[in-house]
């Protein structure tokens, strides 16, 4: 396996080169713009291509070292694609709303994740059957709310090693928190964005669904290439890694080991 390949033609067909109306531009993006067409800024794909490849290499290197990648995209065009792409490569995502402190207050977020796991277990085991319908409804709604906010990171087990972000204006808080903690950020920067604070900027359209799908497909492919490299380096069976490995969470492993030890021996 190798890093996914792409061509400038593919980027053009996906609409990656279309920026926003010239009235909405950010002057800090001037060096990444090719020109203006019909009142729309055109992004310079001659720069986007190598910058996208560099970002993919960075993501690949993170997973090759056993690191975690967090996909972030909460706008409606990106939400489903971000979740699907992260799941496809065994990584993590935030696609509903970025909660303040999601990175910088990880201890509190971890407590909420622990609560979500408890509710998952209770619902799966039928432990709520003895409660009144009202009590069951309250707990079900609590679970849905937590799952919507934290379901994509409940198995992350710690802070991510790199973020991949669609729309830095929409996800400004995620960028700020990552910068504060020194976590690298890969991000799509449209003509109305501020590239400051982005470790691996990728000039491109952050609104068109086809463009978003293209970025996410390439990043998930880079993740999988890194995972495969890690497995190969460790002497594992690459052919057995068709399904991206899901990271084990220590408390879950400990619980499973305890159950196995308590089980009657055949």
Swiss-Prot record:
The keyword Hydrolase does not apply. PANTHER family: 30S RIBOSOMAL PROTEIN S2 PROKARYOTIC AND ORGANELLAR (PTHR12534), SMALL RIBOSOMAL SUBUNIT PROTEIN US2M (PTHR12534:SF0). One of its GO terms (biological process) is translation. This is Small ribosomal subunit protein uS2. Keywords: Ribonucleoprotein, Ribosomal protein. CDD domains: RPS2 (cd01425). GO terms for cellular component: cytosolic small ribosomal subunit.
């Amino acid at each position: 396996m190798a890093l996914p390949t792409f061509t400038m033609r593919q980027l053009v067909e996906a609409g990656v080169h279309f920026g926003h109306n010239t009235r909405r531009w950010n002057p800090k993006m001037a060096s990444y713009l090719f020109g203006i067409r019909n009142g729309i800024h055109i992004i310079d794909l001659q720069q986007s291509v190598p910058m996208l490849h560099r970002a993919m290499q960075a993501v690949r290197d993170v997973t090759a070292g056993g690191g975690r990648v967090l996909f972030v995209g909460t706008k409606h065009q990106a939400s489903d694609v971000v979740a699907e792409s992260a799941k496809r490569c065994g990584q993590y995502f935030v696609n509903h709303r970025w909660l303040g402190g999601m990175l910088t207050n990880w201890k509190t977020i971890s407590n909420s994740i622990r609560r979500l796991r408890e509710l998952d277990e209770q619902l799966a085991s039928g432990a709520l059957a003895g409660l009144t319908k009202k009590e069951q409804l309250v707990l079900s709604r609590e679970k849905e709310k937590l799952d919507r906010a934290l379901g994509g990171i409940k198995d992350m087990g710690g802070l991510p090693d790199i973020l991949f972000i669609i729309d830095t204006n929409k996800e400004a808080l995620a960028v700020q928190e990552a910068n504060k903690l020194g976590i690298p950020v890969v991000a799509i920067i449209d003509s109305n964005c501020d590239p400051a604070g982005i470790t691996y900027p990728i000039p491109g359209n952050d609104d068109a669904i086809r463009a978003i799908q293209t970025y996410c497909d390439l990043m998930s492919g880079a993740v999988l290439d890194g995972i495969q490299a890690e497995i190969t380096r460790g002497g594992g069976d690459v052919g057995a890694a068709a399904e991206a490995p899901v990271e084990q969470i220590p408390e879950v492993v400990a619980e499973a080991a305890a159950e196995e030890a308590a089980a009657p021996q055949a």
